[in-house]
């Protein structure tokens, strides 16, 4: 294909323009070879004849489909105007600041805050392949992080660009991305420290320049270290070429480093006052630029932020203050006035205030500093000479000193930051972020620009090699033949600078000479390079500068200052003075052999991928140039050992206007930063790369029918390309892609557009022809009709007569009758046939329906009798079995109890006789006890008298204390008056001390009041003790009276026993009735036999009738076939009915044998009952004798019981009184000792406080002597008071000694009584047990007699209480089996929802019924802890979380339903209301369970989101549900080799299947429907948010067709909601933003009405989101129109009235508030069964 073929009519080209660099024009006439001009049509409508020649045709413009591409290398035509136009479209119109250029990310500074850097954006880019999302700094960071994690290879991100282009911000965002995606729970503070290092380095290394308000004046390479888990463990920072000259000089409208202005803004704060600073306008070093304020920046607030970051990194306040001291000293040094003394000398006054502050801050001697600022010492071999300096020389020396100090301080801060970021573990990999200055050229370029451009040459060389390498890797991967690509190698420029005898070496050589000058060095350059090296030039009009042809552009450097800046020397005497500084930090800066910083304990050794020539080390060089070359060599060695990623920051305009595109400035930067070089390298190879599928779908329109019939699409693509492009060198076929040379895609687009244009013409031709033909035929037909009617009318008028009219009328009459006859005959025939068919069909249907009804009726009769017979047989067998068991069990119990009763009665008689003998001795003992009680009464009276005396003594002491209290109050008033007088005399500085002393006095007063209160409490305690003694004496008297009443009451109880014996005798009489019941049993046996025989006869008759009926009409097989499936299933449910039906003929024989066996069993049972009746009659006679004997001795037993109980009641009272007296004595002694110790401790504290106050007062001691004397007096009084208290305590001890004697008597008496009473207690216990056994036997007899009366009544089903009985020791087993070990899978299908919860609540009811608080509390705590544990162990198990969320909610609902509260009992049944808790309120546990349920729900949602999130974007956004409507356009983006496609081919069906799985699992586990709706709503919100966020970040998805696909997928989700009956879950509403976004992509976007409709319809989208979608809208085909910037502005103007969020992304982590509805359980607790699989056999239903 010839190039000239592309220059045809309607194609567009680019022509140069002085204002816009390039402007577009359309070819108005086809170009032919040999034409001298090209007829063009400009955009303003004017025509232009553009001069051309075949070798320099204007560059062609790319098709519109390729305009706005994410990657510049994806453009078909790769040249400067195409790149510039693509950037303009993306930046100025689409507001997209990032664009790829191969492996470079081009970042345009928007000069505006954009909402594209939040955590939601970071999470959206995390895990994505580079190229899947829109270009972003986060995409580059993710690519570096992914390659590091996947390949275990170190990475580097190289950020470069002009000052003000956004390098620092881009590097900061990259570091923030790493800190966010690699954050771990254990080392979360490390990421914060890494990010905190940025504000500090910006404060001390950034400054305001004419181009940038926050320009980095140094290079920085930050290595972020990762461990094997790819988590940040530390960092290390390296800096390059700090601009030290800025410390002492700033150009107009520039500032010094930020930290100086922050310090001056905070000068008035108390912590900075000692620095003696003022405003920034007062210091020479900060006011030189003329503007000390940056608009919109608060330096004081920035200072606070800087201090916070210092603290976050672990820098203490002392360290921070040392740094601020040095900074303040630099400012004061700049203000030191140097005056000229003649022409040869200068001087500094020692009284200079700034000099004094400088020396004071740094700990220097002001005299020496003043001397050596104006003099220098020259040391020769023979002597030392002090040479004075002129004023300019002295000023330079002062400034050199300031620069040196600041450089050392900057290095020291970086070193300390590295120490704060160092780590102890082993570094596995690292990612380096290089923030370095880009290529610079100014009106005056000096040594700094030379070093910067030298560094950029090295980086550009490394960049070119890397691009070349990646191209080669791509070709090898696709098996494309490799062809050599010519690219620019800037090694000659590097050699010019760093080679032997290069510019740097000549500069160092000149610096070594004592009299070296800039002019001599420049002359050497002229001699060595002019006319010898084409890259070095000498300006024509200057002898003080030189020109170097750099990669980016030519730069002219002024030689002035090169030597001075390269030497960077400070005079020795000034260094010696600083080295001897008393300020330790300053002295360390100037030590001769400083220890080099060791940032890391263990660093990875990096090796260069390419052998780099090391710098010449012939001489030891300490110049700035040699140091910079060495550090640059190490940097390049590190970068070569890593995988680089490039970010080129572009400054769109110099006025800092938002989204303003200055073409000239941008082209200049694109040329300088290597973007166009990347384009040029790509253009020489195969820049356009499309997959086979993309090519097939895009250019299928160019294929023939035969080619489309091939099944192999890859082969079809090859055939088509061979046909369309004859030159096979213009494309290559790879494994997965087709590679095109520059212009070939545009050529294919031209062919496609021509084909579409031809097709449109063809369609239009046929459509217009069809319309014209249709119109012609319609007109022709109308003309013919008109002619027909006209001609007919004329013919009729000519031929009409009267005869003709008659004949015509007669013919019509004949026709009418004839046609009527024929129609009637046909109708009658059809009607008869129809009636006959209806009769036969209706008869047939009626007979068939009758037969069916008859069959069903007979089948029902058969089923009725069969089921009745089987039911009766089952009932009778169960009834007989139950009766036999009941009779056998009851008879055995009666026999056993009668035998036990006989044995116990014999022993009882013997014991009663022995008790009668002991009765006489007990009476004597009672009399002795009465005598002792009288003695105890006398002792009580003595105690009462002693108590009165003690009370009088206490009252006297109380009066003394009150008197002493009044004295203390008067002293207190005097002390207060004196203190007030003293405070008026003291100065302001002693306010704190006087306040402290006043507080001490108040403490003493409070202590005194506490002592008084303690005395009052003591007296009250003593009075209470006396009163208690009186009450005890009175109680003893009352007890004596009660004993007498008990003796009288015992007679009454004996009468009760007599009545009980009478009742028992009546019960004995009922035994005779039991014999009568046995006789009735025999009679019933005879009746049963008769009934059985009658049943036999009836069954035989019925069976014969049934068999006869069956044999007459049907056979058995016919009945079996006619039974429906439901009948068969119903038969199977009753068990073995089908087999019974088949054996109806044998039923008679089976029944006969069965009834015969029953008859034999009944006869045997009756014989056994007769034997038992005889035995029972004998036992009853024996019992009657025993009852008579018991009646005789009952009276004596009751008297004995009365006596023993009276003795037992007295002895414990004596014991209790004695023990209480002992406890009171011990308590009194302990309290007195404690009070004495407290008073001593307080006195010691008072003395210590006084002693401390005396030491602190110092000079104020004399003024406060009066107060101390008052304190000593109070101390003495307190000591006296303590002594009085001790005397009182001694007195009390004496009183207690007398009481102790009484207690001894009580103890002796108690011991004697206990010995005597022990035997009596044992005897009494024995008698009580005997009586209890007799009573139990009587009760059991009465129960057995009652049961015997009901022996024939059928026992009904057992009624349960809805509780589960368990033992305390089984609680752990219950929790283990029911909660921890329970596996829901396979169990939930066969049980009621929330069965474990119901079981737990039934256990709670049991504990509540016992009124056991400890048991209930233990069960609830164990249950809650068990649920927490099982959830913690299965945090990733969705089914387990769903199961226990359901059970927790059911358990919570049970606690509410059965709590007894009316609001929860509305829907309960009466039986459920009976099951409510009776004793405890568990509302607190309900709150705890609610909190547990909320935590489970949140984890439950997290797991669902984690499972569904990976399939949302592939299924909702990328999958094309509407086949044939492709929503994507081929991008041709060239991914990195590591960007492997990890998608698993998810579709919309995958999303629906995952949702169905979640829904089914929740329903199976019995989750409340309301909770299911809330969970579905949360999932749908996530689906909508993730899809919408991805749409915002993928420009290729913003098209009309993709909007249709999204709308289709949303309809699938809505249909799913409808199928699951979840329309009311509000889930559909959460998809409203996504629905509106899909609508916005499809709607028309041209007119004002369209803008208004968008404003009114898109209410769920914010203004930022709407504008983002409009700016990102990308047409797929040429017939679609782009959204014009004017339309976007119209919409934005309408949206300005909204007050909504400025955030672009939706928060995918947002959780709706969960509510747990109260749903009462419909299941009755009494009916709940426990499956055996639960292993809860130790629980018993009650």
UniProtKB/Swiss-Prot annotation:
Segments forming domain Myosin N-terminal SH3-like: 8-62
GO cellular component: actin cytoskeleton; cytoplasm; extracellular exosome; membrane; myosin complex
Span of domain Dilute: 1421-1697
GO biological process, one term: actin filament organization
Record region (Actin-binding): 632-654
The protein's name: Unconventional myosin-Vc
Function: May be involved in transferrin trafficking. Likely to power actin-based membrane trafficking in many physiologically crucial tissues.
PROSITE patterns registered for this protein in UniProt: DILUTE, IQ, MYOSIN_MOTOR, SH3_LIKE
Sorted UniProt keywords: Acetylation, Actin-binding, ATP-binding, Calmodulin-binding, Coiled coil, Motor protein, Myosin, Nucleotide-binding, Repeat
A family per Pfam: DIL
Coiled coil: 884-1351
Location of N-acetylalanine modifications: 2
InterPro entries xref list: Dilute_dom, IQ_motif_EF-hand-BS, Kinesin_motor_dom_sf, Myo5c_CBD, Myosin_head_motor_dom-like, Myosin_N, MYSc_Myo5, P-loop_NTPase
Residue ranges occupied by any IQ domain in the UniProt entry: 756-779, 780-806, 807-829, 830-854, 855-884
Origin species: Homo sapiens
């Amino acid at each position: 294909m010839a190039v000239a073929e592309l220059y045809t009519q309607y194609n567009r080209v680019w022509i140069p323009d002085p204002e816009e660099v390039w402007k577009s024009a359309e070819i108005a006439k086809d170009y032919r070879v040999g034409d001298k001009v090209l007829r063009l049509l400009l955009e303003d409508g004017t025509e232009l004849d553009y001069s051309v020649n075949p070798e320099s045709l204007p560059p062609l413009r790319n098709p519109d489909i390729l305009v706005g591409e994410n990657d510049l290398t994806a453009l078909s035509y790769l040249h400067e105007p195409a790149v510039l136009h693509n950037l303009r479209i993306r930046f100025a119109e689409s507001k997209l600041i990032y664009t790829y250029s191969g492996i470079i990310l081009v970042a345009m500074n928007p000069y505006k805050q954009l909402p594209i850097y939040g955590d939601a954006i970071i999470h959206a880019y995390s895990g994505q392949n580079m190229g899947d999302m829109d270009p972003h700094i986060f995409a580059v960071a993710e690519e570096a992080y992914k390659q590091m994690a996947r390949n275990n290879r170190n990475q580097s991100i190289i950020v470069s660009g002009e000052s003000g282009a956004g390098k620092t911000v881009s590097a900061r965002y990259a570091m923030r991305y790493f800190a966010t995606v690699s954050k771990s729970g254990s080392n979360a503070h490390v990421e914060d420290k890494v990010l905190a290092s940025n504000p500090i380095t910006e404060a001390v290394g950034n400054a305001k320049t004419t181009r940038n308000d926050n320009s980095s004046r140094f290079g920085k390479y930050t290595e972020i270290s990762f461990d094997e888990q790819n988590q940040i463990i530390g960092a290390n920072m390296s800096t390059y070429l700090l601009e030290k000259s800025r410390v002492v000089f700033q150009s107009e409208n520039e500032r010094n480093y930020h930290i100086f202005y922050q310090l001056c803004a905070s000068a008035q704060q108390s912590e900075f006052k000692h620095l003696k600073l003022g405003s920034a306008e007062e210091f020479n070093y900060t006011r030189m630029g003329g503007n000390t304020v940056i608009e919109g920046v608060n330096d004081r607030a920035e200072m606070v932020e800087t201090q916070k970051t210092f603290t976050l990194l672990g820098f203490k306040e002392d360290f921070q203050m040392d740094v601020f001291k040095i900074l303040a000293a630099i400012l004061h040094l700049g203000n030191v006035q140097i005056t000229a003394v003649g022409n040869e000398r200068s001087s500094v006054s020692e009284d200079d205030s700034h000099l004094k502050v400088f020396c004071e801050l740094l700990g220097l001697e002001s005299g020496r500093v003043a001397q050596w600022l104006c003099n220098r010492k020259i040391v020769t071999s023979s002597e030392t000479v002090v040479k004075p300096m002129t004023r300019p020389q002295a000023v330079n020396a002062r400034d050199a000193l300031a620069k040196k100090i600041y450089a050392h301080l900057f290095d020291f801060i970086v070193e300390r930051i590295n120490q704060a970021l160092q780590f102890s573990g082993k570094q596995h990999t690292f990612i380096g972020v290089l923030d370095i200055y880009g290529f610079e050229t100014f009106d005056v370029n000096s040594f700094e620009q030379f070093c910067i451009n030298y560094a950029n040459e090295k980086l550009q060389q490394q960049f070119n090699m890397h691009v070349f390498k990646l191209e080669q890797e791509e070709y090898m991967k696709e098996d494309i033949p490799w062809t050599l690509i010519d690219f620019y190698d800037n090694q000659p420029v590097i050699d010019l600078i760093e080679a032997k005898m290069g510019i740097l070496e000549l500069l160092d050589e000149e610096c070594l000479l004592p009299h070296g000058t800039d002019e001599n060095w420049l002359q050497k350059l002229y001699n060595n390079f002019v006319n010898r090296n084409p890259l070095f030039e000498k300006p024509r009009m200057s002898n003080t500068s030189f020109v170097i042809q750099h990669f980016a552009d030519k730069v002219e450097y002024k030689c002035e200052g090169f030597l001075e800046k390269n030497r960077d020397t400070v005079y020795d005497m000034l260094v010696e003075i600083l080295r001897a500084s008393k300020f330790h930090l300053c002295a360390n800066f100037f030590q001769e052999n400083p220890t080099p910083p060791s940032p890391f304990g263990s660093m990875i050794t990096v090796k260069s991928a390419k052998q780099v020539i090391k710098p010449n080390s012939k001489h030891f060089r300490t110049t700035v140039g040699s140091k910079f070359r060495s550090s640059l060599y190490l940097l390049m060695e590190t970068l070569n050992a890593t995988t680089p990623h490039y970010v080129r920051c572009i400054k769109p305009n110099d006025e800092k206007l938002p989204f303003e595109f200055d073409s000239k400035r941008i082209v200049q930067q694109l040329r300088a930063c290597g973007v166009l070089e990347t384009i040029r390298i790509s253009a020489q190879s195969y820049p356009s790369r499309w997959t086979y599928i993309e090519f097939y779908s895009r250019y299928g329109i160019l294929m023939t029918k035969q080619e489309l019939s091939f099944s192999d699409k890859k082969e079809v693509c090859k055939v088509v390309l061979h046909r369309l492009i004859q030159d096979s060198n213009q494309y290559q076929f790879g494994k997965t892609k087709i590679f095109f040379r520059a212009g070939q895609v545009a050529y294919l687009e031209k062919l496609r557009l021509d084909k579409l244009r031809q097709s449109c013409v063809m369609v239009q031709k046929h459509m217009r022809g069809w319309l014209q033909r249709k119109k012609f035929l319609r007109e022709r037909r109308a003309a013919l009709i008109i002619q027909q009617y006209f001609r007919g009318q004329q013919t009729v008028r000519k031929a009409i007569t009267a005869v003709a009219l008659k004949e015509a009328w007669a013919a019509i009459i004949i026709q009418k009758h004839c046609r009527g006859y024929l129609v009637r005959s046909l109708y009658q025939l059809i009607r008869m046939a129809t009636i006959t068919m209806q009769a036969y069909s209706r008869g047939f249907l009626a007979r068939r329906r009758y037969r069916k009804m008859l069959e069903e009726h007979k089948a029902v009769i058969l089923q009725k009798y069969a089921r009745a017979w089987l039911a009766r047989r089952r009932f009778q067998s169960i009834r007989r079995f139950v009766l036999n068991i009941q009779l056998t069990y009851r008879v055995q119990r009666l026999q056993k109890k009668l035998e036990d009763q006989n044995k116990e009665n014999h022993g009882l008689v013997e014991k009663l006789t022995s008790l009668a003998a002991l009765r006489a001795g007990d009476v004597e003992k009672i009399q002795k006890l009465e005598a002792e009680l009288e003695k105890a009464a006398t002792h009580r009276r003595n105690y009462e008298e002693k108590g009165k005396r003690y009370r009088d003594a206490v009252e006297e002491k109380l009066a003394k204390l009150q008197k002493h209290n009044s004295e203390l109050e008067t002293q207190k008033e005097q002390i207060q008056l004196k203190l007030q007088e003293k405070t008026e005399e003291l100065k302001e500085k002693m306010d704190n001390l006087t306040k402290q002393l006043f507080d001490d006095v108040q403490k003493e007063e409070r202590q005194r009041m506490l002592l008084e209160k303690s005395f009052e409490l003591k007296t009250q305690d003593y009075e209470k003790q006396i009163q208690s003694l009186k009450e005890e004496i009175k109680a003893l008297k009352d007890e004596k009276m009660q004993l007498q009443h008990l003796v009288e009451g015992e007679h009454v109880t004996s009468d009760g026993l007599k009545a009980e014996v009478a009742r028992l005798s009546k019960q004995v009489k009922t035994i005779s009735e039991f014999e009568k019941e046995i006789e009735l049993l025999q009679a019933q046996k005879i009746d049963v036999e008769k009934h059985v025989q009658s049943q036999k006869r009836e069954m035989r008759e019925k069976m014969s009738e049934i068999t006869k009926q069956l044999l007459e009409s049907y056979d058995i097989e016919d009945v079996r076939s006619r039974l429906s499936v439901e009948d068969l299933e119903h038969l199977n449910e009753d068990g073995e009915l089908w087999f019974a039906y088949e054996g109806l003929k044998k039923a008679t024989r089976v029944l006969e044998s069965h009834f015969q066996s029953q008859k034999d069993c009944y006869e045997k049972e009756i014989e056994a009952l007769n034997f038992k009746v005889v035995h029972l009659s004998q036992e009853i006679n024996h019992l009657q004798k025993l009852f008579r004997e018991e009646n005789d001795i009952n009276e004596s037993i009751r008297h004995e019981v009365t006596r023993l109980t009276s003795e037992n009641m007295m002895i414990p009272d004596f014991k209790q009184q004695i023990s209480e007296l002992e406890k009171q004595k011990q308590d009194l002694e302990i309290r007195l000792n404690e009070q004495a110790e407290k008073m001593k401790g307080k006195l010691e504290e008072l003395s210590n406080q006084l002693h401390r106050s005396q030491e602190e007062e110092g000079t104020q001691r004399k003024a406060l002597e009066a107060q101390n004397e008052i304190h000593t007096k109070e101390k003495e009084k307190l000591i006296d008071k303590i002594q009085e208290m001790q005397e009182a305590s001694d007195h009390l001890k004496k009183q207690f000694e007398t009481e102790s004697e009484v207690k001894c008597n009580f103890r002796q008496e108690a011991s004697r009584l206990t010995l005597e009473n022990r035997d009596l207690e044992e005897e009494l216990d024995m008698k009580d047990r005997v009586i209890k056994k007799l009573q139990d036997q009587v009760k059991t007899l009465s129960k057995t007699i009652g049961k015997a009366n009901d022996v024939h009544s059928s026992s009904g089903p057992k009624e349960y209480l809805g509780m589960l009985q368990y033992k305390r020791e089984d609680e752990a087993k219950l929790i283990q089996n029911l909660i921890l070990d329970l596996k829901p899978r396979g169990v939930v299908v066969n049980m009621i929802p929330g069965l474990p919860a119901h079981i737990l609540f039934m256990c709670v009811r049991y504990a509540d019924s016992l009124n056991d608080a400890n048991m209930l509390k233990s069960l609830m705590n164990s249950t809650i802890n068990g649920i927490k544990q099982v959830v913690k162990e299965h945090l990733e198990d969705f089914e387990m979380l769903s199961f226990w969320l359901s059970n927790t909610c059911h358990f919570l609902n049970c606690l509410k339903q059965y709590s007894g509260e009316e609001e929860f009992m509305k829907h309960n049944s009466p039986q459920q209301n009976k099951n409510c808790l009776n004793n405890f309120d568990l509302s607190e546990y309900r709150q705890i369970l609610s909190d547990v349920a909320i935590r489970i729900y949140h984890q439950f949602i997290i797991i669902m989101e984690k499972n569904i999130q990976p399939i949302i974007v592939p299924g909702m956004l990328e999958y094309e549900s509407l086949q044939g409507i492709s929503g994507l356009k081929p991008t041709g983006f060239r991914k990195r080799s590591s960007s492997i496609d990890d998608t698993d081919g998810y579709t919309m069906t995958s999303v629906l299947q995952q949702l169905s799985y979640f829904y089914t699992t929740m329903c199976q586990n019995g989750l409340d429907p309301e909770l299911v709706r809330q969970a579905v709503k949360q999932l749908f919100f996530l689906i909508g948010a993730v899809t919408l966020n991805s749409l915002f970040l993928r420009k290729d998805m913003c098209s009309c067709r993709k909007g249709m696909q999204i709308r289709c997928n949303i309809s699938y989700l809505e249909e799913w909601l409808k199928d699951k009956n979840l329309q009311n879950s509000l889930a559909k509403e959460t998809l409203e933003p996504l629905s509106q976004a899909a609508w916005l992509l499809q709607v028309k976007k041209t007119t004002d009405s369209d803008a208004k409709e968008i404003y009114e319809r898109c209410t769920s989208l914010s203004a930022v989101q709407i504008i983002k979608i409009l700016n990102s809208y990308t047409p797929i085909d040429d017939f679609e129109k782009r959204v014009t910037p004017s339309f976007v502005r119209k919409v934005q103007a309408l949206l300005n009235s909204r007050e909504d969020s400025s955030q672009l992304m939706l928060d995918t982590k947002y959780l709706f508030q969960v509510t747990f509805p109260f749903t009462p359980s419909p299941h009755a607790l009494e009916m709940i069964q426990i499956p055996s699989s639960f292993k809860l056999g130790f629980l018993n239903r009650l």
